[in-house]
């Protein structure tokens, strides 16, 4: 199993459930079986009155979760050119249902987001009730580099960031550290890497029969106080004003050019982000622009329904397969995009990514 499940019993007989992503060789990238296992156990734990709290974490020092296992998806896309592969329809439906479940979980759900927290890993972290980051945390939605787009609810949480930071992070795939995550409302608590055992011990010592919220908050607060001096310096809020000015534009092509002009700036953080965009997928930039505009007033369920259509349509078009080939399979880092110029991406192609590609009722129609 690529996810390990265990249940520990606390001092008062209450039980703590722990789910550990256990595929460190792939940085705990989510495969369909892992997603299905998580969904099954989380639903069972929600119904078990003996389970009082859930902790979601990843094995290995490098990553909580570096995204979805897209290699298998691309193999399926290549086997079904121009179509929606059955694996894609199943994978994205299961993943988005899992994300929705996390956001609406009925019990305290903590997620330990150390190391790389990318793509699908962000979907898991953002769904947790207590999102914990560490000195090694690097959170990002880097889909611009592989011809996909920030999914797993990215439309929802990026569109709600201050100013135009969500648009910037979606377009550039730029990583944020723990301080950034706390500042932007993408994390709740900061702890050191070596405090996880203390956290588990503390959870097992709590009296889960009364004043649960107060006790849990006191535990988290105490651990965070111990770690306070290890919080890294902020990167993105100090640059927000400049980013807002740069992205005060009317369309994605202008945004592409405006960010691109930062590539040779002395500010290495902005320059690196600009370089990533300029090597990225122009179609993705259009999708990011559109998804954030459309998601602004949507519920999470509506966002995931929209993203389901987008993801299936990405599987029908060549950019996703080509991006994964260049970045993850052949690793030549030289993608040959079908539309290499952002100004030449047809508006009809962008719009088509939001259209249904299934018969009858939306497969995620029950997500409120």
Residue ranges and their predicted role:
Residues 153-155, 160-215:
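Contiguous mid-protein beta-loop-alpha structural module that forms a pocket-lining wall or clamp
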Residues 129-150, 185-200:
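Gly/Pro- and small hydrophobic-enriched strand-loop and loop-to-helix capping segments
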């Amino acid at each position: 199993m690529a996810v390990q499940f265990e249940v520990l019993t606390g001092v008062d007989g209450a039980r703590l459930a722990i789910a550990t992503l256990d595929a460190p060789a792939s940085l705990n990238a989510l495969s369909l079986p892992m997603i299905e296992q998580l969904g099954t156990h989380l639903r069972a734990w929600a119904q078990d009155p003996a389970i009082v709290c859930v902790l979601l974490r990843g094995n290995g020092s490098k990553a909580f979760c570096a995204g979805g296992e897209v290699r298998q998806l691309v193999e399926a896309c290549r086997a079904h050119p121009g179509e929606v592969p059955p694996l894609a329809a199943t994978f994205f439906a299961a993943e988005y249902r899992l994300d929705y479940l996390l956001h609406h979980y009925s019990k305290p759900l903590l997620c330990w987001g150390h190391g790389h927290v990318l793509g699908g890993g962000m979907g898991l972290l953002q769904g947790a009730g207590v999102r914990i980051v560490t000195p090694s945390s690097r959170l990002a939605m880097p889909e611009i580099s592989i011809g996909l787009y920030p999914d797993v609810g990215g439309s929802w949480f990026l569109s709600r960031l201050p100013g135009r930071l969500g648009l910037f992070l979606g377009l550039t795939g730029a990583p944020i550290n723990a301080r950034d995550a706390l500042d932007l409302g993408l994390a709740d608590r900061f702890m050191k890497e070596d405090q996880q055992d203390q956290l588990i011990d503390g959870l097992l010592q709590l009296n889960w029969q009364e004043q649960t919220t107060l006790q849990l908050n006191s535990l988290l607060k105490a651990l965070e106080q111990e770690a306070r001096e290890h919080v890294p310096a902020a990167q993105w809020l100090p640059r927000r004003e400049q980013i807002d000015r740069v992205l005060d534009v009317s369309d994605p092509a202008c945004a592409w050019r405006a960010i691109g002009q930062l590539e040779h700036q002395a500010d290495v953080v902005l320059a690196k982000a600009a370089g990533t965009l300029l090597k990225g997928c122009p179609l993705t930039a259009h999708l990011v622009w559109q998804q954030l505009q459309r998601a602004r007033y949507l519920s999470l369920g509506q966002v995931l329904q929209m993203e389901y259509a987008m993801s299936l349509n990405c599987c029908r078009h060549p950019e996703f397969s080509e991006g994964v080939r260049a970045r993850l399979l052949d690793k030549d880092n030289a993608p040959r995009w079908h539309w290499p110029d952002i100004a030449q991406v047809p508006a009809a192609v962008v719009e088509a990514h939001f259209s249904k590609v299934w018969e009858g009722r939306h497969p995620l129609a029950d997500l409120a």
